[in-house]
Regions:
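Intrinsically disordered, low-complexity terminal tails/loops enriched in metal-binding residues
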Residues: 1-228
Length: 228
């Protein structure tokens, strides 16, 4: 059963222009929440720059890709951030989006394996229809040919509602491959439409979650696509 959870914000993938230093993030699940430890290559806590009003943007998915959480941990100490999340006895992967000041950082999958010894990954089946109804809203995905290393255009046609600005954009999209290793976080080409562009480095099946805000609430529309 699909589960989608979110908080109201949006995030981009960030790549610092700095060339010095690396930052690593680790995660553990404890007492009903995720603890995230952030440390640079000198063993120090890097200063994080606000990105879209938050210091940290966190995507958590179950490894079978049936659960999706969009969260924003709070800083609780110099190195530590924490957020409550209702994870079950399953295996999960986290992707942490931050912008350390003066340091390089690359988003990597963080396995959260202390919940379950089993590590069951998704066996995705390509959607036959790209029309999805969630919370009474109908959204159709019109996507250009899915060719690896080529620019892909995704147009989301919202049939029976008008999306609201979602911190400067009309939505955002998270894309993860079925091995839960590749991560894309995409936002519209302009503030006035729901057209997104991206590129895939590897062929295969991917799950896509599109988030749109209607009347103050965010709805999540899941799709499975295949890149050749």
């Amino acid at each position: 059963m699909e589960q989608h959870h979110h908080q109201h914000t949006e995030a981009h993938l960030h790549h610092s222009n700095a060339v010095d230093g690396n930052v690593e993030v680790s995660a553990t699940f404890q007492n009903g929440g995720l603890n995230l430890h952030v440390m640079d290559d000198e063993g120090l806590a890097p200063k994080l720059e606000l990105t879209h009003e938050k210091l940290m943007h966190l995507i958590v998915v179950s490894n079978d890709l049936n659960e999706f959480y969009h969260l924003h941990p709070k800083q609780v100490s110099e190195h530590e951030y924490r957020v409550d999340v209702p994870l079950s006895n399953s295996s999960y992967t986290a992707f942490v989006d931050i912008l350390p000041v003066g340091k390089n950082y690359h988003i990597k999958p963080i396995r959260i394996n202390n919940l379950s010894e089993q590590n069951t990954f998704a066996n995705l089946k390509k959607d036959n229809s790209l029309k999805k109804e969630v919370d009474g809203k109908m959204v159709e995905l019109d996507i250009s040919p899915l060719k690896v290393l080529e620019e892909i255009t995704m147009k989301f046609q919202i049939k029976n509602a008008v999306p609201e600005p979602y911190l400067g954009a009309l939505g955002h999209v998270v894309i993860i491959d079925q091995k839960v290793e590749q991560f894309l976080h995409v936002h519209p080409e302009s503030e006035n439409d729901t057209v997104f562009k991206t590129q895939f480095d590897e062929p295969g099946r991917y799950k896509l979650w599109a988030e749109f805000k209607f009347k103050g609430e965010v709805s999540v529309f899941p799709y499975v696509i295949e890149v050749e």
